[in-house]
């Protein structure tokens, strides 16, 4: 008979992760609609914390073997430097596992130092695990190819050097990533040709923001800097394409206040992202944004026009995030037809769709859409997550021509999620100028 106790530590953690994951699926399908919003949010957070820490534990066990056991050996009485190294690694892993606790319990107007430290450690953890895994695979390949004892010994000594090299590369990349993420977003000027654009709206300036992620590591001061940069561009329209926040209004009301200082001539608009739904407080954010003069496009659209030419307008539509329906968030779910109901095909249609997958689905339903603005990918945010983001999304970053009449622009995001690092990506404020095609 199968014995759970005979499994390795990694096997036990893997099974525990699977159990938690399936409990999340069951609760979403059978329980979520039978409990109130607050209880549902609490249940999701507890399950998410258990699941993410189970996955982190798998990586931590591997990391401990590589950077402690391999570097320090298996001596019964470790030396003082070896003891210090073990303590440092233990503290590091404790901070890594505590990072998502900070997301739920240490959110305020400005980031708490412990949140910044924990999520920085998480970034180091991700980078280090990647290089340890790659070097480990190379080492195993070397063992398979080696035929002599001397060759095997050379591979073993090379494994030690590879671990040290992984630590050095990680340190360099982490410092670069922290410095890069701390810089102001880069203003990127993009000129996009739009068919059927009226003459009166030729040259319309639209500023695109996305993935600000107000929360444990992004606070009021960073948002204030973003808003100041937006106002310097003197835009006609500002759009925020999802993932504005990672927590409830009650915790971030003060941090979000700078949003009310944006003064575009023709209005500010918002469409939801998946993280906005994770807060379980979308209606609260809709109300706060409305009080600041920002219109939430909840499967709806607005007419954008210049006051002197009201008959010439753009249909600016926004759809709920793809995950709203999966999360069974009451009254929410992506509905392209509802969002575009009332838009005329004689004029241009611009759609705000947070996820590139949503952009693809929307264009399959309505190929008459002129331009889709998306975010979500962060352009990977930091290597090696760049690889996953590229492989998992139909549009990764930048401007894409989908057809003769349709284009998609994916911003790498204006902020960052959790980990205050950007490697092989940048924070961006996109200054779009619409031109007649």
Swiss-Prot record:
- A Pfam family annotated for this chain is Metallophos
Gene3D superfamilies membership = 3.60.21.10
What residues does a divalent metal cation 1 bind to? 211, 213, 243, 378
Q: Which domain of life is it from?
A: Eukaryota
Annotated membrane topology is: Multi-pass membrane protein
The membrane-spanning stretches of this chain are 7-27, 41-61, 87-107, 116-136, 164-184
Q: Which GO terms describe its molecular function?
A: hydrolase activity; metal ion binding
- Supply the name of the protein: Transmembrane protein with metallophosphoesterase domain
- Source organism per UniProt: Danio rerio (Zebrafish)
């Amino acid at each position: 008979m199968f014995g759970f106790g005979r499994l390795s530590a990694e096997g036990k953690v893997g099974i525990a992760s699977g159990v938690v994951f399936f409990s999340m699926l069951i609760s979403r399908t059978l329980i979520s609609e039978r409990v109130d919003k607050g209880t549902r949010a609490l249940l999701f957070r507890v399950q998410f914390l258990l699941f993410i820490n189970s996955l982190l534990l798998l990586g931590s066990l591997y990391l401990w073997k590589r950077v402690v056991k391999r570097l320090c050996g298996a001596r019964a009485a470790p030396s003082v430097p070896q003891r210090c190294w073990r303590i440092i690694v233990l503290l590091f892993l404790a901070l890594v596992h505590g990072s998502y606790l900070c997301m739920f319990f240490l959110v305020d107007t400005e980031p708490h130092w412990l949140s910044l430290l924990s999520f920085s450690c998480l970034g180091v953890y991700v980078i280090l695990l990647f290089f340890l895994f790659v070097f480990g695979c190379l080492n195993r390949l070397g063992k398979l190819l080696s035929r002599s004892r001397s060759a095997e010994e050379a591979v073993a000594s090379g494994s030690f050097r590879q671990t040290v090299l992984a630590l050095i590369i990680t340190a360099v990349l982490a410092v670069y990533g922290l410095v890069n993420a701390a810089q102001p977003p880069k203003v990127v000027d993009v000129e996009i040709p739009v068919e059927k654009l009226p003459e009166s709206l030729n040259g319309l300036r639209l500023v695109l923001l996305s993935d600000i992620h107000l929360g444990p590591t992004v606070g009021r001061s960073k948002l204030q800097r973003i808003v100041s940069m937006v106002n310097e561009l003197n835009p006609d329209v500002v759009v925020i394409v999802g993932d504005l926040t990672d927590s409830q209004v009650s915790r971030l009301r003060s941090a979000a206040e700078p949003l009310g200082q944006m003064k575009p001539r023709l209005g500010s608009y918002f469409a939801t992202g998946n993280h906005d739904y994770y807060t379980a407080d979308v209606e609260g954010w809709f109300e706060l944004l409305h009080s600041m003069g920002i219109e939430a496009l909840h499967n709806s659209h607005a007419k954008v026009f210049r006051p002197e030419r009201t008959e010439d307008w753009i249909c600016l539509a926004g759809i709920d995030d793809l995950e709203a329906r999966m999360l069974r968030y009451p009254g929410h779910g992506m509905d392209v037809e509802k969002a575009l109901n009332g838009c005329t095909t004689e004029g241009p249609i611009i759609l705000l769709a947070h996820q590139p997958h949503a952009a693809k689905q929307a264009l399959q339903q309505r190929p008459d859409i002129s331009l889709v603005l998306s975010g979500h990918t962060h352009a990977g945010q930091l290597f090696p997550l760049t690889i996953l983001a590229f492989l998992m999304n139909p549009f990764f970053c930048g401007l894409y021509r989908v057809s003769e009449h349709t284009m998609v622009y994916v911003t790498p995001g204006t902020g960052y999620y959790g980990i205050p690092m950007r490697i092989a990506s940048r924070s961006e404020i996109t200054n779009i100028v619409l031109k007649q095609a």
